[in-house]
Amino acid sequence: MSRYESCFAQLKANNQGAFVPFVTLGDPTPGQSVDVIKALIDGGADALELGLPFSDPVADGPMIQRANLRALESGTTFKHILEILKEIRDYSPQIPIGLLVYANLIYAKGVRNFYQQMKDAGVDSVLIADVPTKEAKRFADIAKEIGIEAVFIAPPDASDALLIDIAKQCAGYVYLLSRSGVTGADTQMQAPASELINKLKEAGAPPTLLGFGISQPEHVQRALAAGADGAISGSAVVALIEKNLDNNAQQVADLKAFVKSMKAATQLS
């Protein structure tokens, strides 16, 4: 059983949904990044979604773009990323670790080599932000060979054929977008995506996590009410890092408290 399967089975047994925070690796510095991610775990995160810093993160809004910039400006290297991932894996042997990455970063290392290095660092899944489902199969095939789960994005306007394709190829979980556009906590999540979720379930897809615009406990409750298995929050988490760049202790305390409040909203009645 994979870490994701164990995680979702445990949540189901406890009648809970998943809360998954997102941060950029190396933000604000490689050293502080470790403290940040440990705070997310200590706050009760069910899984982690971690971004590899990239100079042109087209799927992300201003908040996460600035996080990418901070990580790169602080000198975060690929070596640092592997070290951070290994330290987090040692800190929490069971938590599922997902990566959000842009294709250029994979090509730069060589596709097979990239996945192998991530597997060795303790990563469970990889989502490629800028590769459409149709073109992602070759990445997914290599990932599967190596033992990494390939996560796919299901957009809100996905056709039935695309949803079936996603259900077939996707592993770990499906990242379901609550709306189109770029990430951001200011843009509220749109109407519940229950129709899409039902279609994915019927097609045999892995669990669905709803993302984009998830910044308050009631957003988590709405995601679960729509039938999602959990919710991902990125910009709202990164905002707490940005707010306390000069105060590491406050940063950690705020992150822990935020995750705790979001996790509390995952309890199903």
Curated annotation (Swiss-Prot):
Give the protein family: Belongs to the TrpA family.
Instruction: Say what the protein does.
Output: The alpha subunit is responsible for the aldol cleavage of indoleglycerol phosphate to indole and glyceraldehyde 3-phosphate.
* Pfam families documented for this protein: Trp_syntA
Q: What is this protein called?
A: Tryptophan synthase alpha chain
Taking the record's annotation, the residue ranges forming a coiled coil are: none
Task: Spell out the GO cellular component terms annotated for this protein, sorted alphabetically and separated by semicolons.
Answer: cytosol
Q: Which organism is it from?
A: Idiomarina loihiensis (strain ATCC BAA-735 / DSM 15497 / L2-TR)
**InterPro entries in alphabetical order:** Aldolase_TIM, RibuloseP-bd_barrel, Trp_synthase_alpha_AS, Trp_synthase_suA
Pathway info: Amino-acid biosynthesis; L-tryptophan biosynthesis; L-tryptophan from chorismate: step 5/5
What are the GO MF terms of this UniProt record? tryptophan synthase activity
**What is the annotated quaternary arrangement, including any partners?**
Tetramer of two alpha and two beta chains.
- Its EC number(s): 4.2.1.20
Catalytic activity line of the entry: (1S,2R)-1-C-(indol-3-yl)glycerol 3-phosphate + L-serine = D-glyceraldehyde 3-phosphate + L-tryptophan + H2O
- What CDD domains does the entry give? Tryptophan_synthase_alpha
Q: List the active site.
A: E49 (proton acceptor), D60 (proton acceptor)
